[in-house]
C-alpha cells in the first residue's frame, strides 16, 4: 500500500513524549521488548495493512502505522518505551469498543486493516499474551453493519486477462452473492466494472509474491491499460489464479467434482477469476467462514447493455451534475420498504431484461396489485418489519452476528409467515413465490424467540442473552448469584447493627471487589474480624473472610453463567448459519415482491400505464413524461410528448421513422425529451409501468446516449475528442434493435466540420444501422436529410414568438425548426443590447450569403427509397448532398 497522504490530511498532533523511532526498519529487533518484537514480526507478515494490535481495552499501532492513523484519523501520536536500548517508539491507538467506527474510516480512505486479537485472558496468561491476526478488513471484505451501505452492494471483484479475452468474478460477502462471467474486449471489462462499482478489485500480476494495494486514483504500470483507475485495486500473485488451483478451490468450497453444475466448466478465465477471489477471502478472513451462495455464471447477452456513459446520462442511480441520489431515477421510483429490496431494485435498473416472458411476469404482478390499495398497504406494513435477511444470514454464517442480529432475524422470519398468508390467493408468479415459507425457517424463528431475550445487550460475554427456564443449569447459576448478591445487600444493614456505625457502607469496584467502607473518624471502631484493605483520605476500606468468600462465589458463578450463555448463543447462531443459503433464497423472493409493490405505488400515484411489450422494433409512446422531472414540478406542470420510432413506414401524417431529427432552441427541453424516451424504454424492460398514457415498445438490446460532454483531463482529451470517442463507440456497437439518443453531435469543432460529421453520423445510423434514433441538433440544415432518406423524419420543440421574447412550449411535434433562437437565448441570459443587435446583423448576412445556406436552398429534395439492411457498404455514397 502506498504511504502517500492526501494534502488535506491534518498535520500529526504529538503527545508530551516524542517518539525516537517511527520506522520499524530502523530499530534493532533483538533489543525490542518481547511484545514489540511480536508486533514487528506480525507487521512483516501484513506489510500492506494497518495492524491493529489488541492491548487490554485498546487496539494499538506502532511505528509507521501509528503515524499513518494519527494523520488519517486525527489522533494524537504518543509513544511507548520499547526496550532500554531502543527507547520510545511511535504509538497511536483506538478504544476496542470503537473498532468498527475507526476501521470503517480507514477502509474508506483506502487502507486495509489487520485485526490482531488477544487469544487468551491476560490475567491468566503465562508470559506474553497470545495474540493472532483474526481477520483482515479490506474495502471489498466488509461484514459489519456499521461499515456497509444498507441500500447498495459492497462488491469484491477479481479479473483475469488473456489476450483480448477476460474472466470476471464478483461477490458481496455480506449478502452471499457470487457470480462469474467470461467475455472479450478490454473495453467491455471496463464497462462491467463501472456497472458493478466494486469497492475492491483483485488482479494477478507476474511480479513474484507481490501484494500491493492501489488506492483510488493511484497510477501504476502494473494496472492493465484501459481500466478505470477510480477503484481500489489489490495486486495479487499469479499463484492463486492458476487454472488448476482455482478449479480445485471452487470444487472444495462447493463440494463438487465438476464445475458443470455451476455453469463454468468451459469458461477457464471465469474459473480462474472466481478461484482467485476465493483464495483472497481465505487469506483475509482467516478462520471466519464466509457463507457464499452457489457460484452463478451469467452472460452479458442476458441483459440490455448500458455503457457507463449511458448510465451517467440517464442518471439512473445518481445525478450527472453533482452525483447525488436525489434527482436520479432510483430516487424517483424506489418505494421499497427493505434494504435488500432497495439493493435489488438498483440491480434491476442496471441490468434491464431482454426476455419478454420475464418482463411480462413482473408486469403481471403490478397489474394484480394495482387495484388492491388496501392489500398493498398491508404488504408494505409487513415488509417494513423485515430486517436485512441477506446480511443477517451472512453474519450468522460467518460467526459475527450478535444477539440483536438473531432477534431481528427471528422477527423477520416471523413476518414471512404472515406474508405467505397474505399472498396465498395471488396469481402472479412473483407473488406466488412467497406463498410457501420453508417450515424449517418458521421453526428456527420460534426457537430463537423462545431462547433469546427481547432486548439483548450487544456484548456476548457479559450475560443477559438467554431467557429464564431455557436451561436448568443456567437457572441454577442465576439463582445462586441472586442469593449471594442478596446476602451482600443485607450485609450493610446487619453490620451497621452489629458495629453501631451508622455511616458504614458496603461498596464495590473492579480493582478491589466488594469492601466495607468506614469513615476515618470511626475507623477505630471496626471489629477485630475486619481486615484493612485500603486507606483513603476520608475513609478506610475493609474486607471480611466471609465477604471475600461470597465475592468469589459470585465471580465464579457469573463467569460460568456468562460462558454458558455464550455457548448457548453460539449454538443458536450456528443453527441459523446452517440455513443461511435458504434464508437468502427466501430473501430474494421478498426483495422482488418489495420492488413490485413499490413500483405499483409509483404507478398508481404518478399515473403510469402498462406498456405493451413485443420483440418488434416499435417504440410508440403517447403522452410520455420524464419520471424524475415530473416529480420535481407541481402536478400538471410537466408537458407530455409522444414518440414514434421503428415501425414500418407508412403514408400517415405522423410517420414512424427509425431516426428523428429533433430541432429547437436551447433550454426548450430537447435533452429532457431524449432522456425521457430512454428512461421509459428502460423502465419497461425492468417490468415496470411507465409514465405515459399508453406505450407499445419493442425490446431494445442496447440503449446509447450521448448527451453533453466535458473534457477528460485524466487522458488529456478535449470535449470534442470525448464526444467523438463516444459517438464512435455507438456506431461500432449499435444494431437495428438498439435505441440511440444523441444530443448536439459535432458542436465542439468548426461549423463546417461539425455539420459534416453530424450529417454523416445521422445518415449512417438511419441508412446503415437502422437503429431507432433521436438526433437532437442545432444544425437545422440536417432537416434536409429527411428528404433524402425515407426512414428519417423531422420533429421540433415548439416555441411561441412574441415581439420582445420567446416562450418555450416544450411540445414536440412534426416538422423541422428553421431557427435555433440562440440570439434570443443570449438576450435572456443578459448579453448587452449592443451585442444582441450586432449578432442579428451578422446572422442576417450569414443566412443570405453562407455557402451552406445557399447550397441547401438549391439542393435536391427528392426522397430516396429505403435500402435493405444488407446494403451496408455503399449506402452513404449514394446520397448526393445538397451542398
From Swiss-Prot:
Entry-linked Gene3D superfamilies: 1.10.1420.10, DNA repair protein MutS, domain I, MutS, connector domain, P-loop containing nucleotide triphosphate hydrolases
GO molecular function: ATP binding; ATP-dependent DNA damage sensor activity; damaged DNA binding; mismatched DNA binding
Binding site for ATP: 664-671
Pfam families, A to Z: MutS_I, MutS_II, MutS_III, MutS_IV, MutS_V
Family: Belongs to the DNA mismatch repair MutS family.
HAMAP family: MutS
Biological role stated in the UniProt entry: This protein is involved in the repair of mismatches in DNA. It is possible that it carries out the mismatch recognition step. This protein has a weak ATPase activity.
UniProt name for this protein: DNA mismatch repair protein MutS
Species this chain originates from: Acaryochloris marina (strain MBIC 11017)
Name of the gene encoding the protein in the UniProt record: mutS
Amino acid at each position: 500500500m502506498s504511504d502517500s497522504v492526501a494534502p488535506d490530511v491534518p498535520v500529526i498532533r504529538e503527545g508530551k513524549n516524542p517518539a525516537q523511532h517511527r520506522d520499524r526498519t530502523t530499530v534493532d529487533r533483538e533489543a525490542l521488548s518481547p511484545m514489540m518484537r511480536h508486533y514487528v514480526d506480525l507487521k512483516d507478515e501484513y506489510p500492506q495493512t494497518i495492524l491493529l494490535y489488541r492491548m487490554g481495552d485498546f487496539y494499538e499501532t506502532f511505528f509507521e502505522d501509528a503515524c499513518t492513523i494519527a494523520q488519517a484519523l486525527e489522533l494524537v501520536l504518543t509513544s511507548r518505551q520499547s526496550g532500554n536500548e531502543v527507547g520510545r517508539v511511535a504509538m497511536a491507538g483506538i478504544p476496542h469498543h470503537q473498532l468498527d467506527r475507526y476501521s470503517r474510516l480507514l477502509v474508506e480512505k483506502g487502507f486495509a486493516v489487520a485485526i490482531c486479537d488477544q487469544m487468551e485472558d491476560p490475567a491468566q496468561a503465562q508470559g506474553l499474551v497470545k495474540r493472532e491476526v483474526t481477520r483482515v478488513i479490506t474495502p471489498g471484505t466488509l461484514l459489519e453493519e456499521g461499515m456497509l451501505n444498507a441500500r447498495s452492494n459492497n462488491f469484491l471483484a477479481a479479473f483475469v486477462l488473456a489476450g483480448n479475452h477476460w474472466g470476471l468474478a464478483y461477490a458481496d460477502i455480506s449478502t452471499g452473492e457470487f457470480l462469474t462471467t467470461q467475455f472479450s474486449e478490454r473495453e467491455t471489462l471496463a464497462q462491467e466494472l463501472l456497472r458493478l462499482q466494486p469497492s475492491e478489485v483483485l488482479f494477478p500480476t507476474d511480479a513474484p509474491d507481490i501484494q500491493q494495494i492501489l488506492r483510488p486514483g493511484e497510477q501504476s504500470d502494473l494496472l492493465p491499460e484501459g481500466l478505470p483507475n477510480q477503484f481500489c485495486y489489490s495486486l495479487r500473485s499469479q499463484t492463486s489464479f492458476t487454472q488448476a488451483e482455482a478449479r480445485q478451490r471452487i470444487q472444495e468450497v462447493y463440494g463438487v467434482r465438476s464445475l458443470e453444475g455451476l455453469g463454468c466448466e468451459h469458461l477457464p478465465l471465469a474459473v480462474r477469476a472466481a478461484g482467485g477471489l476465493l483464495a483472497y477471502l481465505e487469506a483475509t478472513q482467516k478462520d471466519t467462514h464466509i457463507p457464499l451462495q452457489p457460484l452463478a455464471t451469467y452472460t452479458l447477452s442476458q441483459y440490455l447493455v448500458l455503457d457507463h456513459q449511458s448510465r451517467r446520462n440517464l442518471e439512473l442511480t445518481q445525478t450527472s451534475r453533482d452525483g447525488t441520489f436525489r434527482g436520479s431515477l432510483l430516487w424517483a421510483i424506489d418505494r421499497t420498504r427493505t434494504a435488500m429490496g432497495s439493493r435489488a431494485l438498483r440491480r434491476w435498473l442496471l441490468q434491464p431484461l431482454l426476455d419478454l416472458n420475464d418482463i411480462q411476469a413482473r408486469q403481471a404482478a403490478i397489474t394484480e396489485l394495482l387495484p388492491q390499495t388496501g392489500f398493498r398497504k398491508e404488504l408494505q406494513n409487513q415488509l417494513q418489519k423485515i430486517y436485512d435477511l441477506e446480511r443477517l444470514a451472512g453474519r450468522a454464517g460467518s460467526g459475527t452476528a450478535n444477539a440483536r442480529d438473531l432477534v431481528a432475524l427471528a422477527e423477520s422470519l416471523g413476518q414471512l409467515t404472515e406474508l405467505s398468508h397474505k399472498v396465498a390467493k395471488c396469481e402472479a408468479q412473483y407473488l406466488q413465490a412467497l406463498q410457501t415459507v420453508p417450515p424449517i425457517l418458521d421453526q428456527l424463528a420460534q426457537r430463537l424467540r423462545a431462547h433469546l431475550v427481547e432486548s439483548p445487550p450487544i456484548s456476548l460475554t457479559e450475560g443477559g442473552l438467554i431467557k429464564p427456564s431455557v436451561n436448568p443449569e443456567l437457572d441454577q447459576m442465576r439463582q445462586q448469584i441472586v442469593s449471594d448478591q442478596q446476602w451482600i445487600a443485607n450485609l450493610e444493614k446487619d453490620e451497621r447493627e452489629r458495629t453501631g456505625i451508622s455511616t458504614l457502607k458496603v461498596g464495590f469496584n473492579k480493582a478491589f471487589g466488594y469492601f466495607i467502607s468506614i469513615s476515618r473518624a470511626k475507623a477505630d471502631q471496626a471489629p477485630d474480624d475486619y481486615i484493612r484493605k485500603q486507606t483513603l483520605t476520608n475513609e478506610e476500606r475493609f474486607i471480611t473472610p466471609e465477604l471475600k468468600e461470597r465475592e468469589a462465589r459470585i465471580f465464579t458463578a457469573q463467569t460460568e453463567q456468562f460462558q454458558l450463555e455464550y455457548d448457548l448463543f453460539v449454538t443458536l447462531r450456528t443453527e441459523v448459519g446452517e440455513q443461511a443459503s435458504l434464508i437468502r433464497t427466501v430473501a430474494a423472493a421478498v426483495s422482488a415482491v418489495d420492488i413490485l409493490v413499490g413500483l405499483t405505488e409509483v404507478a398508481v400515484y404518478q399515473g403510469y400505464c402498462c406498456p405493451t411489450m413485443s420483440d418488434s422494433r416499435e417504440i410508440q409512446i403517447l403522452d410520455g413524461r420524464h419520471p424524475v422531472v415530473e416529480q420535481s414540478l407541481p402536478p400538471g406542470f410537466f408537458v407530455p410528448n409522444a414518440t414514434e420510432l421503428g415501425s414500418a413506414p407508412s403514408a400517415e401524417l405522423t410517420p414512424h421513422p427509425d431516426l428523428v431529427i429533433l430541432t429547437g432552441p436551447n433550454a426548450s427541453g430537447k435533452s429532457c425529451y431524449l432522456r425521457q424516451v430512454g428512461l421509459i424504454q428502460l423502465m419497461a424492460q425492468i417490468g415496470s409501468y411507465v409514465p405515459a398514457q399508453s406505450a407499445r415498445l419493442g425490446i431494445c438490446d442496447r440503449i446509447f446516449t450521448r448527451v453533453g460532454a466535458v473534457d477528460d483531463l485524466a487522458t488529456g482529451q478535449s470535449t470534442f475528442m470525448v464526444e467523438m470517442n463516444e459517438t464512435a463507440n455507438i456506431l461500432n456497437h449499435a444494431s437495428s434493435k438498439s435505441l440511440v439518443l444523441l444530443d448536439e453531435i459535432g458542436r465542439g469543432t468548426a461549423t463546417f466540420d461539425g455539420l459534416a460529421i453530424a450529417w454523416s453520423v445521422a445518415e449512417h445510423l438511419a441508412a446503415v444501422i437502422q437503429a431507432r434514433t433521436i438526433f437532437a441538433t442545432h444544425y437545422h440544415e440536417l432537416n434536409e436529410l429527411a428528404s433524402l432518406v425515407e426512414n428519417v423524419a423531422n420533429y421540433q420543440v415548439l416555441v411561441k414568438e412574441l415581439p420582445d421574447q420567446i416562450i418555450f412550449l416544450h411540445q414536440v411535434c412534426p416538422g423541422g425548426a428553421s431557427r435555433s433562437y440562440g440570439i434570443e437565448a443570449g438576450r435572456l441570459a443578459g448579453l448587452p443590447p449592443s451585442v444582441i443587435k450586432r449578432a442579428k446583423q451578422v446572422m442576417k448576412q450569414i443566412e443570405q450569403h453562407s455557402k451552406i445556406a445557399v447550397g441547401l436552398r438549391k439542393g435536391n429534395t427528392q426522397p430516396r427509397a429505403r435500402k435493405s439492411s444488407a446494403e451496408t457498404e455503399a449506402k452513404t455514397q449514394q446520397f448526393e448532398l445538397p451542398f
